[in-house]
UniProtKB/Swiss-Prot annotation:
Catalyzes the reversible phosphorylation of S-methyl-5'-thioadenosine (MTA) to adenine and 5-methylthioribose-1-phosphate. Involved in the breakdown of MTA, a major by-product of polyamine biosynthesis. Responsible for the first step in the methionine salvage pathway after MTA has been generated from S-adenosylmethionine. Has broad substrate specificity with 6-aminopurine nucleosides as preferred substrates. The keyword Transit peptide does not apply. The gene is mtnP. Phosphate binds at residues 12, 54-55, 87-88, 186. The keyword Nucleus does not apply. The record marks 167, 222 as: Important for substrate specificity. It comes from Bradyrhizobium diazoefficiens (strain JCM 10833 / BCRC 13528 / IAM 13628 / NBRC 14792 / USDA 110). InterPro entries: MTAP, Nucleoside_phosphorylase_d, Nucleoside_phosphorylase_sf. Keywords: Glycosyltransferase, Purine salvage, Transferase. This is S-methyl-5'-thioadenosine phosphorylase. It catalyses: S-methyl-5'-thioadenosine + phosphate = 5-(methylsulfanyl)-alpha-D-ribose 1-phosphate + adenine.
Length: 291
């Protein structure tokens, strides 16, 4: 079996990962451009960890400016088998107040300015996104949260908006009445690209606010978010430490096939594939392209 390598993408408020033993910076070049930041490698409880701050240190990148393809590509090149996204979000549910960690199981993509696939002209592929989150990772995350006494909600739909502005009241009410659970700005196309790269993916959506739908709460502001972010970031780091301690040391096959998503996805005939695009796909799709 393959050794498990746990990737952590840190969202707003999580720009480093204390507790990494043997921590060192690693710069990996990507044919898809510059990732958000150099990777931080190390171990926690003996488990290989690769950390990437999504917005760079100091929160230099807005959600629309992040090079999601380069981020996923360098994580794949670093050997990551399982990827956890730590992401701030707003809540549409009374039962998911600020401070709650939501283990979402579905996404709705409302972004419109981002490159959302590694594939395209010269090599077309269609991966399934019916079940975008690894149920195995959600089970491990739930167990880790319970062990740390962290309030979690199991399941929910994350709607990803383009940003960087927050929602209008009409938008917020539309999302709430649609039955969505939380709203954020970063998990799409990240989850789609992780699937194309055959990396098992799960999100911990960390609630900071009620967006602007709630009659008893003011419209969300950056100041409000920062106040909750500090507490959420501390809990997230404790969650990662516990997860790493109990995580299997060998990569477990994904029950929904995330780690073999390209087996039936490629549609372009081999003789019609663009050699230049294939070079860029060496890490993401090398398993099937070389086979």
């Amino acid at each position: 079996m393959t050794q498990a390598v746990l990737g952590i993408i840190g969202g707003s408020g999580i720009y480093d990962l204390p507790g990494l033993e043997g921590a060192h910076e690693e710069v990996i070049k990507s044919p898809w451009g510059e990732p958000s930041a150099p990777l931080r490698r190390g171990t926690i409880a003996g488990l290989p960890i690769v950390f990437l701050p999504r917005h760079d240190k100091g929160h230099r990148l807005s959600p629309s400016d992040i090079n999601y393809r380069a981020n996923i590509d360098v994580l794949k090149r670093a050997g990551v088998t399982d990827l956890i996204s730590l992401s701030a979000c707003g809540s549409f549910k009374e039962e998911m107040p600020p401070g709650t960690f939501v283990l979402v199981d579905q996404f709705v993509d409302r972004t419109h300015k981002r490159e959302s696939s590694f594939f395209g002209r010269g090599c077309v592929a269609h991966v399934s996104m019916a079940h975008p989150v690894s149920p195995r990772l959600r089970i491990h995350l739930a167990a880790a949260a319970e062990a740390e006494g962290i309030a979690i909600a199991r399941g929910g739909t994350y709607v990803c908006m383009e940003g960087p502005q927050f929602s209008t009241y009409a938008e917020s009410m539309t999302y709430k009445t649609s039955g969505y659970s939380v709203i954020g700005m970063t998990n799409m196309p990240e989850a789609k690209l992780a699937r194309e790269a055959e990396i098992c993916y799960a999100t911990v959506a960390m609630v900071t606010d009620f967006d602007c739908w709630h009659p008893d709460h003011d419209a969300v502001t950056v100041q409000d978010i920062i106040r909750v972010l500090t507490s959420n970031a501390d809990k997230a780091k404790a969650l990662v430490a516990r997860l790493a301690k109990d995580f299997p040391r060998e990569h477990e096959p994904c029950p929904i096939g995330s780690d073999r998503a390209l087996d039936t996805a490629l549609i372009t005939a081999p003789e019609a594939r663009d050699p230049e695009l294939l070079k860029k796909l060496d890490a993401v799709a090398g398993r099937v392209l070389r086979g």
